[in-house]
C-alpha cells in the first residue's frame, strides 16, 4: 500500500530560511492484514492542501535538478559584469546558517538523511497499526471523512516526532545547497571564460563576413603594371613575394591577394614568351649552321683562295627558306635575254634556291655580275621524245662546259596542214616559244612523254577552248570543223589496232566499209574479178 508522506525540499529551505514548505511524495508502507484481505489500495491525500505542498520549480526541467549547473544554453554574458552584479546586491542572497562543511561532514549528513527516512517509514507503519482496530471497514462516505481527518493530523504528528531530524536535515541541506551553489557558480564562470574567446572570434568573423567590404577587382593600367614589373625585376622573378612587391610599389588600394594573383599571371605569361624566344633562337641557329655549311662547300668547290665580297656576304647572311618555286620579278629582270636562242627552245625552268645547269654552285646563292660572253644553257621544250640525249650532268656542273649545239631541224614538227598551208618555219630571235596543243588521248596512251625534272607534266596544261563563233560566220565554222578533224597519225594508229586485233569491236568513230567502196578499191588496185564467196563474205 502506498501512503502519502511529506519530504523537506532543500531549495525551499534555502529560499525561505526556515522550514515549513513541504513536497508531496509517495513512500511504500507495509501492507496491513485488512488490506491484503480486501485487495484494496488506499491513497491518503488531502485535496485541500495538495496544491500548497507541490513544488513546481523543478517541473520545467525534467530529469535535472536546479542546482546541477548550466542546463540552459549559454548566453553571451561577461563574467565581470555578472560578478559585479552579485557584489552590488548582497542582501538578496540568504545568509548561510552554518560554516562550510569539513572533509568528514558530507558522510555524516548522508547518514542523517538515511536515519530520517527510516524513522519516517517506521512512524507511518506504527500509526497505521494503531488506527486499525479489527472492525469491519466503514461505509464509503464515512471512510472518506476519516481519511481526511487522518491526513490532516498526520503532518502534525510527523513534525512532533521528527523535530530533531528536521533540524539536522535542514542544516545539512543548507550546507549542501550553499556548497552546490558555489560549485555551480565557479564552473559557470569558468565556462564563460573558456567560451568567450571562441564566441568572440566567431562573432568577429561573422561581423567581417556580413559588414566587411567586398573584394574589389583591380584595373591593372599600363602605369600600374609598369611599376609592378619594376618591383618584380628589382626583387628577381624567382625571389619576388607579394608582400615585398606591395612594399616597393607603395600603393594603398592594392592588397596582397591582388599582387599574388597578378604575379602568378605574369610568371605564366613570361614562361610562354621565353619558350617562343627559345624556339626562334633555335631556328636562327639552324639557319646559320646551314649557311656556314653552304659557304664552306662553295669555297671547296671554287678552288679555295677565291673569296669575293658576294661569298662573304652569303656566309654571313642567314638562309631564308623559299616560299615558292619561282624567282621574284626583280631577279628575273636582272637576267639578260639570250642573243640567239635556237628555234623551239627556251631556258629551263629555274627553281629559286637551286643551282642551274652550267652554272657553278657558288653563283647559286649570289650570282656574279653578268658577263657578255656567258650564256645560260638552253634546252628544247617540245617534242621531248625527239630530242637527243643531253650530255652527262656531272661533267657540265664540275667544269662549266656548255652543251654542244643541236641542229634546230631535229626539233621541227614534221607535219603539213593542207588547209592552213603552213610547214616548218624558222623562228626569229626574240619570238616567245609556247608549248603546242596537246596531242589526242590515244597518242598520249601509246606514246607517253617521259617526265622531265623541273617541268610540269603535260596533263597539267589545260588549253583554253576558243569562244564560240557567231552563227553567220561561215569561215569560222569551217575552221572549227577542220580543227575537230583527227590527224592522219591518229587514224593510222586506230586502223593498226583494228588489224592486229580484228575480234575486238571497232573503236568509236570507225565504221565498217561498204561493198561498193571495197569493189572500187579492188578495181583500182588491178583486181577486176572477185570470187563470189569473197563478195558474199564481204557483203
From Swiss-Prot:
Sequence ranges of Low complexity compositional bias: 99-111, 121-130
Recorded GO MF terms: DNA-binding transcription factor activity; transcription cis-regulatory region binding
Region (Disordered): 86-218
Domain called HTH myb-type: residue spans: 212-271
Signals that turn on the gene: By light.
UniProt feature, compositional bias: Basic and acidic residues: 144-161
Subcellular location: Nucleus
Tissue specificity field: Expressed in leaves.
DNA-binding positions: 242-267
Protein function: Probable transcriptional activator that promotes chloroplast development. Acts as an activator of nuclear photosynthetic genes involved in chlorophyll biosynthesis, light harvesting, and electron transport.
Full protein name: Probable transcription factor GLK2
Organism: Oryza sativa subsp. japonica (Rice)
Organism classification: Eukaryota, Viridiplantae, Streptophyta, Embryophyta, Tracheophyta
